[in-house]
């Protein structure tokens, strides 16, 4: 997408939808924990009741998108199987079982007798979510929005339009049955609406883009609303020389082939030169049998990798069964390569040397840095967050998989009894600053 583009003003109809979402979000944010949990239960029930219609709509989307030439990785993300849908429904129920993120007192302090300060978590307000291909993302984000007391304007890709509409109909049915948050969730359906969303800074508190690098960059450059997200998912796995070869191959395979279209799948494998020959001799046939195309540097080509990796491959997110391989001298060279090419999403090291592992963990500045495990664990559900609205690679929090805690902010409450600053400025009164129990 070109950035030399003037984002149009939102239409009156879109402004009206945003106003309704804002009003509904205030009501939802003031609802009780029990009410929001009941709403999620009804949303899950409605999804389950309408599962056949949702899956039928998904087949229609898949058939149309395949005819239109949608690429393989996006088709993979678009597909919603019966098993995946059931997992999404279970995820909604698990979100309802998570601790209430609203109303948590983070600070409780006496400033002076009868002058008490509190810092308490509150909902953000309205989320603007733009996502491509994955209809399951709609379910995840909607459930987290409701649980955290936020409204949401959601725009999915046109390739998933029938699936998304069937899902939204079910979610809305659940909210109406629970009699809480009706109108808090709205599905945007046109490109004009998604562009207009970027100008709704009076109503939308956070934009969460989930899609291509181009999509994320375009949004970041064309809105005044805070943006949570990441562009590319260029993840690395480094195999050290102090390693169990079988363990390393197993972790590398899982990090690549378990779901290659995921943003937490590795795109580059770095191998210590001391064990490169042994690793590739055993690993190449296994990767080949799994249909993985390997592209290597000069050293790895000399050890059997058939395809050449050029400079652009080190910064490429394949989202497919393609893996770049580079042989490095040591952990320091691996770290330098990662610093140069990483998108700061997730990196991992396989080593039995704890000192080398700690060096890697403390030196790599990514949202997730792992030791002896697959990069595919970078996921809100696997972290125990219930689900995630997205993954943030920014340095400021929230960072990494963002669940409920990333969808609330805080507010300061100060309760007094006629207290005046002039009394403290004159010295007649003084601050006690005593921390009280939370």
Swiss-Prot record:
Reactions mediated catalytically: L-glutamate 5-semialdehyde + phosphate + NADP(+) = L-glutamyl 5-phosphate + NADPH + H(+)
Cross-referenced CDD domains: ALDH_F18-19_ProA-GPR
Function (record text): Catalyzes the NADPH-dependent reduction of L-glutamate 5-phosphate into L-glutamate 5-semialdehyde and phosphate. The product spontaneously undergoes cyclization to form 1-pyrroline-5-carboxylate.
Top-level taxon of the source organism: Bacteria
Name of the protein in question: Gamma-glutamyl phosphate reductase
GO molecular function, one term: NADP binding
Listed EC numbers: 1.2.1.41
One matching Pfam family: Aldedh
The encoding gene: proA
Pathway recorded for this protein: Amino-acid biosynthesis; L-proline biosynthesis; L-glutamate 5-semialdehyde from L-glutamate: step 2/2
């Amino acid at each position: 997408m070109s950035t030399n583009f003037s984002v149009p003003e939102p239409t009156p109809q879109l402004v009206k939808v945003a106003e309704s979402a804002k009003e509904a979000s205030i009501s939802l944010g003031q609802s009780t924990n029990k009410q929001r949990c009941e709403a999620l239960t009804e949303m899950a029930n409605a999804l389950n009741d309408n599962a056949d219609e949702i899956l039928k709509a998904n087949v229609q989307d898949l058939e149309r998108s395949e005819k239109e030439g949608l690429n393989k990785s996006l088709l993979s993300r678009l597909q919603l199987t019966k098993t995946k849908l059931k997992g999404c429904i279970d995820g909604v129920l698990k979100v309802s079982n998570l601790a209430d993120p609203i109303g948590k007192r983070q600070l409780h302090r006496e400033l002076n007798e009868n002058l008490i300060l509190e810092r308490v978590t509150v909902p953000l307000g309205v989320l603007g979510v733009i996502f491509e291909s994955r209809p399951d993302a709609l379910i995840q984000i909607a459930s987290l929005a409701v649980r955290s007391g936020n409204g949401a304007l959601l725009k999915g890709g046109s390739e998933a339009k029938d699936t998304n509409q069937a899902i939204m109909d079910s979610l809305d049915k659940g909210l109406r049955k629970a009699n809480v948050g009706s109108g808090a969730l709205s599905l945007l359906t046109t490109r004009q609406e998604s562009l207009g969303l970027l100008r709704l800074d009076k109503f939308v508190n956070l934009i969460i883009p989930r899609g291509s690098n181009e999509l994320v960059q375009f949004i970041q450059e064309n809105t005044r609303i805070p943006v949570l997200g990441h562009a590319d998912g260029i993840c690395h796995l480094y195999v050290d020389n102090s390693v169990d070869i079988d363990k390393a191959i197993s972790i590398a395979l899982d990090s690549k082939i378990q779901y290659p279209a995921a943003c937490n799948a590795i795109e580059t494998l770095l191998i210590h030169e001391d064990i490169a020959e042994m690793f590739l001799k055993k690993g190449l046939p296994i990767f080949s049998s799994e249909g993985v195309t390997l592209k290597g540097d000069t050293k790895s080509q000399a050890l059997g990798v058939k395809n050449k990796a050029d400079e652009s491959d080190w910064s490429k997110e394949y989202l497919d069964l393609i893996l770049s391989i580079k042989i490095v001298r040591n952990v320091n060279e691996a770290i330098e390569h990662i610093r140069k090419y990483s998108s700061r999403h997730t990196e991992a090291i396989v080593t039995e040397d704890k000192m080398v592992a700690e060096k890697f963990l403390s030196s790599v500045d990514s949202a997730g840095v792992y030791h002896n495990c697959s990069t595919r664990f970078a996921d809100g559900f696997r972290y125990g967050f219930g689900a995630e609205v997205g993954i943030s690679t920014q340095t400021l929090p929230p960072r990494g998989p963002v669940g409920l805690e990333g969808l609330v902010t805080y507010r300061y409450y100060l309760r007094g009894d006629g207290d005046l600053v002039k009394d403290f400025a004159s010295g007649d009164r003084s601050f006690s600053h005593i921390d009280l129990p939370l």
